[in-house]
Every structure is written in structure tokens, then in C-alpha cells.
């Protein structure tokens, strides 16, 4: 049976179909918004997974190129690994859904969102969050409540819900708000230095717009939703819990109140070892329960410390930033480096400048086709003092890199202002919370050190939240460290400049957070950001006047677009010859902009000279210094500009009669010639005789 329900959201139809497709999935839906369609399938294992201490949720966001009428490139002509954008979209869906499953739920759950049709005016990533929530609500899988997502744009101080492609180009804000009926669940934002008050208002606007989609989901559940399963939830053995608490409660409290991180961790390890020695034999098959009890005891102590004792694990005030350190110019051969330290968190970012042609080409369903500014983030095991295999970037690393990239993107100069491709790599050297925002600070240092004329320096900070069990008490924390992140309820990352916010990313372990938290976190983040920006300014107050000696020197010239073929030549013969002879990189745009790059400045000058010669028009009456390239019985061919030759007839070689061309010139000679005529076929006639006569007349006038 096919169940169909539709509603109007921001002037467009949102529709869900349930029961027609994917009959063997727990729930499968087609959900559309305009002509963008997401196929969502959700399934769960019948029994909990044994021996784990986490909820095994898997969210997959699958892009199909047929959705935009494309055939994949490459030899095999099929989709390969998910793109970075697909990974980021999958993470956004995951972060929105995860807190809404029951605590202690250990069944494997998989949510697969497949993008099957895309209309550029309606973003599939926004629809995917709504589609995933709808499918879970309609399924029998335990899921607390509907959650909705909208995108908010800002044009001329007016908020726009789910802006179309044209509006997204004009908008200075790109905000995604996910919310339940009562609380905000997740926030993603990028903006052109948006003032705090406007950002808060935009989030409230997005929350209100989410309510229509939540009502739509609730209506669908009433009409054709499945009855929910009663799950088997993980609970700790009561006897284990009682014994461990009686034995270790005082020791845990004493250890957690140690302010030094290393000493605290050592004390906790000692408690764990004592517990193992005391109860290892008695509860040899209950190590999972013991681990859970110890975790809950530590969490309770930290939360009591923050909410009741009003003190933080390291002794700081709630709005205090850890000690800061900034340094630039660490590495001798790189184009720019920045070392940023905040407490025990330390990130080194390296900037590399490349030619315009070094841009990243994107092959996917996204509107963007290329990127000239990119940020990569590496988080090795040694950053937390652990031994781990070094593999490629995981989802978390891709997500943190994209977040830092988004924070600086509005501040990067245009290609016209700064004709370089820019790559940043952040190496996390030490991690004790908020490495993504430390990467923003390190990136600012590296870009300024590299001579990139940023609009303004940027900095980032991570805010946290601790709440009581009944949510009656809330405490926002500035610059959270690892222990506060681990045992806390929220990670609220804010980056920006002195003028406003450039990026936000928020996720929570709760079933949402209040607007009071949003306002306090954003306003406290600004205070912290100003402190960090002052420290950055003390280290380096403006971009270097020149790029590094080891960076490519790029110069731009403008040529007539009709002359581009003259520079490229048949099959690229001419441009490849220039590149080979001068050692430069040449990139040509359709509008006639030519970018010439090389670490050898002389090579750049030589290449530009050749290109200007190739595109310069030969004019009758002008005098050129040319090189003899060929001799015949009737004259000499002379190259006056690159790839442009003319004929000096034997009668035009000298003032006197010439019997043999070789008597006057030889191949390779440089001579001054005058253009006497360009005939209808474009052939150039030259005269050395006219130049000599002009010189003679000039000398005679000077003698008089």
C-alpha cells in the first residue's frame, strides 16, 4: 500500500511516500521537496550487540550522479568512495539523530539516505535530515520524537527560509537549524562576519520554521506510522554498581578534583587498577558493567563540581580562556607557518601557495565545480599520547578540516586581489579539547605569515554546557577542555573576527538545548574571541608585505579573448613551448586573464614578454627589432614578434642596390625593420631601407 502525504513548506511542496518501496526495510520512504528527492531506508538488528559500550548507529549519505544527469568519470564509470561533501552531510544527519535514541540502546541501526534526484534550488542535505527523521518516526525503531531542518539565508537584512540557488549566491549567511518541537538540536553556519544579535535572531527564525515540518511528520506518524518496538536497554548489574560505588566513590572524587591533567589521569588509572584487583575475579564476566559504573561516577563528580561547587576541573573561571601562545615562521622552506597553543591543545598550520591552475576540481552533485582555497586537518594518535596506526583521514578529520575552512573562507581575498591557490594543513600536535578551533587560529597565523591579505584575522573557540538531570540548571563553559567535552552535554564551536561570526557548529548529547544556552554561548564566545585575537595581533598584526621567497611569483596580464588561440597554438604547441623554455605555469581564463606563475621571477618576465608579443597586433608604419630566420634569393624573412614573420624584399634591404641577400644579412642577425604593408591575406611586408632612410633624414635635420 502506498501512503502519500504532502504539505507546503516555504511555498514549495514537501511530500513523503511510504509503503510503496523497500518493502523489506523496517521503513523506506521517498521524500521530495520540489524536484529534489531522497530515498531513505532505516533498519535495526533484532537483538542488542554484546560487549560494546556505545550506540552502534551508522548513517550513510549516498550521492548518485544520475540525480543530476551525470555519468561518473574515470575508467569504471560508477560512483566510488563518497565525496567530502557527502561525508559532511552524513555527519550532519548523524549528529542530529543520535541523541534522540533511548539511552542504553545497543541494537545496530543503519540509516541510508540516497540522493536520487536533485533540483539546484532545493538542497538535498537539508531534505536528508528531514527524510531520515521521517523514516525513523514511521518505523518501529525506538526514536524519541520528530526533528526537522531548514536552511536560513540573509539578504538585505531579511531572513529567507530554504533559499533557492540565486538567493544562496546573494546571501551573506548560510545557516542550518535542526530542532524538535521544544528545543534546538543542531546548528551549522557559515557567514560573512554576521553580528551576534543577527545570528541569534536567525537561529530563532529557523527554529520557528522547523515547526511546520515537525507537524508534517507528526501527521504522517498518526496516519501510517508503525507501532514502536519495546527495546532491551543496557543496564548495569545492580550488585556490581553497589560494590564499585562503595569501594571507589571516595577515591574517584579525590582523583577528579586534581587540577593537573596528567596527575588526574594517573590517579584515575590507579583507581581503575585497584577496582580490577578487587573485583576482577568476582565479576570477571562483568567488565563492561564495571567500566560503565566508573564512567558514570566520574561524570557525576565532574557535573557536581561544575554545577554545585561552581569550579572547573583545572580551576579556571567559567568564562576564562586557557593560557595562549602564538608563533609564526617556524619552518624555513614553507610559505607560511603558524603555531597556536591553548593550554594543552596545540596546532601547527602550514600554508602553501600555488598557481591558479592548482585548484581542486570537484566531481559530484554539488553546485561548486572547483576550490582555490582548501583546509586539511590531521589528528594523529601521538596528539593524545597514544599509539595508533597512521591511516588516511577519517570522517572526523574531514569534518574538522571543513569547519576550519568555512571559518576563514569569507576572509580569503579574491583571485583578482591575490592570484594564488591556497592550501592549509593543520597538524594537531597535542589535543586537550577544541582542536578544530585551534586550527582556525593557527590558520590565521599561517596565512598572515604567508603574506595572504586576509580581510581580517579570525579566531575560534569551543563553548560547552553542563546541565542537571531535570534540566533545571544550566552552566555554559568557555574554552572547554577534553574532560569537560567528554562528560559535558554540548560542543558549541564559534569562529569569527572582531566584526562578527564566520562559522558555527553545534551538537549535543541531550535531546536539544534552550535558546538561553544559544544566546549565552554566542555572547560569551565573542568575549573569548576578542582575547584570542589580541594575542594573535601581538604575534603578527598584518600580512607579510611579500610572499615567501620559495612561493611562486604570480603576475596577471589581460589579453584579447580572441587571441587566446594564438597563445595556446595548435594542440597546445605554443603554450607548451613557452612553459618548457621559461619553466613557468600558465593558466588562461575565458575572459582573457592570463596568470603566469614561477618561483623564478625572470622566467615569469620572459613568459609575459612572449605572451604579449604573441597577442600584440602588428601595425603598419611601426619599427621593430627583428631576427632573420630565413634567407632566399628574393629577400629575408624576419621574425618581428613571437610567431609573426614578415618579408624584407631584396630591394628593401639597403639604401644601395643589393646583388645578394647574404651580402647584407645572415640568419640570426637582429635588424631594425619597418612595417610597410599588411596585405589582405595578412602577410607582412618589411623594409630595412626605410629605417635607414628615416635615420639619415633625422641626422640631416639635426646637423642643420
Curated annotation (Swiss-Prot):
Q: What is its EC number?
A: 2.7.7.8
The record's subcellular locations are: Cytoplasm
Q: What is this protein called?
A: Polyribonucleotide nucleotidyltransferase
Transmembrane segment boundaries? none
Which BP terms does GO give this entry? mRNA catabolic process; RNA processing
Entries under InterPro entries matching the protein: ExoRNase_PH_dom1, ExoRNase_PH_dom2, ExoRNase_PH_dom2_sf, KH_dom, KH_dom_type_1, KH_dom_type_1_sf, NA-bd_OB-fold, PNPase
Q: Does the keyword Iron apply?
A: no
Which organism does this sequence originate in? Clostridium botulinum (strain Alaska E43 / Type E3)
